[in-house]
Regions:
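C-terminal structural segments of small proteins and small subunits
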Residues: 86-112, 116-119
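Histidine-anchored nucleotide/phosphate-binding helix
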Residues: 18-31
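Anion (oxyanion) recognition and catalysis
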Residues: 29, 71, 110-111
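Short beta-alpha junction loops
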Residues: 41-44, 84
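Short, glycine-rich nucleotide/cofactor-binding loops
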Residues: 5-19, 51
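N-terminal beta-loop-helix "entrance" segment that forms/cooperates
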Residues: 43-57
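Short internal beta-strands
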Residues: 35-40, 77-81
Length: 119
């Protein structure tokens, strides 16, 4: 199987685009692929406990359900450290399975993966 890093940059400002990386991560994991979900820019807010509870894209599964699915599947959720600091998000604010990572971690993961998918 393949390995993916799926990145999301949109948060509550665009519910549809915010939901798509979680949907892609869920489907990729269900197909047996290795997945890292990288949240950066406004998407880091989705890594904060409770933020995704009220996000639903147009005709899409609610984000809270997709988040629960990727958490249950063991998908690593990486939250951009600089983006989190800018939004006053600390590791204690994050959902289960999420961790704060830096650009060196992201670049290393991109270099090691078969594919990168960006939303």
């Amino acid at each position: 199987m393949a390995s993916f890093i799926i990145s999301g940059s949109r948060g509550t400002d665009d519910p549809t685009m915010a939901t798509l990386p979680f949907m892609a991560a869920k489907v990729a994991k269900e197909q047996g692929h290795d997945v890292v979900l990288w949240l950066w820019n406004e998407a880091v807010t989705l890594g904060r406990k409770g933020t995704g509870d009220h996000v639903t894209g147009v005709n899409l599964t609610p984000l809270k359900d997709l988040l629960a699915a990727v958490q249950a599947a063991g998908v690593q959720i990486w939250v951009c450290g600089a983006c989190a600091v800018a939004r006053q998000i600390s590791s204690g604010d994050l959902v289960a399975g999420a961790s704060i990572k830096g650009m060196p971690d992201y670049i290393k993961a991109v270099a090691e993966r078969d594919r990168t998918i960006a939303f």
